Design a protein with these regions (language model features):
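N-terminal secretory signal peptides that target proteins for export/translocation
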Residues: 1-7
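Generic signature of intrinsically disordered, low-complexity, basic-rich segments
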Residues: 5, 20-21, 103
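Intrinsically disordered, low-complexity regions enriched for glutamine and histidine
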Residues: 6, 17, 26-27
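Short helix-onset patch at the extreme N-terminus, typifying the N->h transition
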Residues: 7-8, 36
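General helical structural elements
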Residues: 8-11, 74
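Bacterial N-terminal signal peptides
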Residues: 11-22
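Hydrophobic small-molecule pocket/channel-lining residues, especially in calycin-type beta-barrels
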Residues: 26-171
Length: 171
């Protein structure tokens, strides 16, 4: 009788440990941290004259914050780096961008925590006209941690634009 009770207690203890480990391992949110370099051959830059993408993206992420530095070539051929800071609590945050634009963004995670989504609205003035760009960026890291894929779409007065950017972790 004592052996049966002991076996049941041991079984439920083991089951509880397995359940805890599996929910901890599978519940972990994607972490985008790393220095990433664009693989132009694997990327789809979209159509039109704005076929450009950051050549490098450097990301640091902790439990509450995502910091991102995107470096692109400017029109004059020199590097241009934009720095953005996002909160991971689902609340709106603001970043200042090109032409004194204001980018309001919210970060969310997919239900399986494998995709980080940044939903943004950027407002700015150009030649006296107020402009607005709405953007959704979905970031995923490959299982081996060496590839970052960014599916991005944006909408403005000039139409819709879609890109799939593939970055490889810099060695």
């Amino acid at each position: 009788m004592k052996t049966k009770v002991l076996k049941q207690a041991l079984f439920f203890t083991f089951l509880s440990i397995c359940l805890f480990v599996s929910t901890t391992a599978f519940g972990q949110k994607v972490n985008l941290s790393g220095n990433w370099k664009l693989n132009e051959g694997k990327s789809q830059l979209g159509e039109g004259r704005f076929r450009m993408a950051p050549a490098t993206v450097n990301i640091t992420q902790d439990e509450t914050t995502l910091n991102m530095e995107r470096t692109s070539k400017g029109q004059n051929g020199q590097d241009f780096t934009s720095k953005e800071k996002y909160t991971l609590d689902g609340k709106e945050c603001e970043n200042t961008g090109f032409m004194n634009s204001v980018k309001k963004s919210t970060v969310t995670f997919s239900s399986d925590n494998k995709t980080l989504t940044i939903t943004s609205t950027t407002t700015f003035e150009r030649e006296g006209n107020k402009m607005e760009i709405k953007q959704v960026e979905n970031f995923k890291v490959s299982d081996d941690g060496n590839t970052l894929t960014l599916d991005a779409s944006s909408t403005s007065q000039r139409g819709e634009r879609k890109q799939t950017l593939v970055y490889e972790k810099a060695k």
